[in-house]
Amino acid sequence: MGLKKFKPITPGLRHLILPDFSEITKEEPEKSLLKPLKKSGGRNNFGHVTSRFRGGGHKRLYRIIDFRRDKDNIPAKVASIEYDPNRTARIALLHYADGEKRYIIAPEGLKVGDIIMSGENVDIKIGNNLPLKNIPDGTLIHNLELYPGRGGQLVRAAGTAAQILGKEGKWAYVRLPSGEIRLFDLNCRATIGQVSNVDHQNVSLGKAGRSRWLGRRPHVRGSAMNPVDHPHGGGEGKAPIGHPSPLTPWGKPTLGYKTRKKRKPSDRFIIQRANDKKEK
C-alpha cells in the first residue's frame, strides 16, 4: 500500500493525498455477503440529532464481516483483498475448504493465495486467530475480544495493533493502541498481526467536497454560533468564549475534562490509563 500525491493544477488537488489502492485485487464485492445499509443522518429513532455533522454521502452496501472467527481448524484460502467503504481497513475474502465464504479484516502483509486458520493451537502466523493463552508475549494482535465468544471489538481500525505484554493467572496484560494497559481473559481471542492500510493516517482529503462524499457535514465552531445554540456563541466580532474553560454545546466542561463514570466495574481491569505514567 502506498500514497498518491497530485500536481496542484486545481485547488482541490493541491493538498490531496490518497491511497493508491495497489493492494486491492477485486473491484466487485461478494454478493452473498452484502446487505442493505440505511443512512441515519446522525438521528435516533425519535428523529433527534445524536451525532452532529453527519448526513449525505455516497450510498453504501454493508459487507458482513466475520469478527468471531469461530470456524475452527478449517483452512481458508485468501481469495481477494477488497475495499470496504464502511471502515478504514481493507477486508479479505476467505474461501474455506468446506465451501463457505467469509470476509475478515485484512491484516498488513496478507496476500491472495495465503492459507489461514482459526483454532486453539494453530500456528502463530499473520491472519490466524487463536486464544490469548496460546499467543506468545510481545506478539502484535488485532480484532481483540473484550469477553470470550463475543467476537473482536477492539483494534479494528486501519494500521492499529495491540501487544501482549505478559500473562498472570487467568489474565493477559495487553497494551492497546491508545497506550492503555488492560487485563483480558486468556480465553479471549485475537488475530495475529497489524491491521492493513497503515498509511491511512497520512491521507489528506484535499477539499470539503470529498468529506461530503464520505457523509461528513461541515463542523461548525461554537464561537461562530448564536448564544441560543452554543455556550461559546454570541458577542461582537471575534469575541472570546466568555467562560473559564471551553464547554460542550450542552454546557459541560471539555478539553481535558474526565467523562468516564466513577467506580465503573471494568476499572479493575485497567492497569494503566492511556498516557498515564503512574500505574494504579
Curated annotation (Swiss-Prot):
Stored Gene3D superfamilies: 2.30.30.30, Nucleic acid-binding proteins (2.40.50.140), Ribosomal protein L2, domain 3 (4.10.950.10)
Alphabetic keyword roster: Ribonucleoprotein, Ribosomal protein, RNA-binding, rRNA-binding
One GO BP annotation of this record: cytoplasmic translation
InterPro entries in the cross-refs: NA-bd_OB-fold (IPR012340), Rib_uL2_dom2 (IPR014722), Ribosomal_uL2 (IPR002171), Ribosomal_uL2_bac/org-type (IPR005880), Ribosomal_uL2_C (IPR022669), Ribosomal_uL2_CS (IPR022671), Ribosomal_uL2_dom3 (IPR014726), Ribosomal_uL2_RNA-bd_dom (IPR022666)
Keyword RNA-binding: yes
Keyword Chaperone included in the entry's annotation: no
GO terms under cellular component: large ribosomal subunit
A GO term, aspect molecular function: transferase activity
Top-rank lineage group of the source organism: Bacteria
Region (Disordered): 215-280
Pfam families linked to this entry: Ribosomal_L2, Ribosomal_L2_C
HAMAP family referenced in this protein's UniProt entry, alphabetically: Ribosomal_uL2_B
Family: Belongs to the universal ribosomal protein uL2 family.
Entries under NCBIfam families matching the protein: rplB_bact
Functional summary from the UniProt entry: One of the primary rRNA binding proteins. Required for association of the 30S and 50S subunits to form the 70S ribosome, for tRNA binding and peptide bond formation. It has been suggested to have peptidyltransferase activity; this is somewhat controversial. Makes several contacts with the 16S rRNA in the 70S ribosome.
Assembly information from the UniProt record: Part of the 50S ribosomal subunit. Forms a bridge to the 30S subunit in the 70S ribosome.
Protein name: Large ribosomal subunit protein uL2
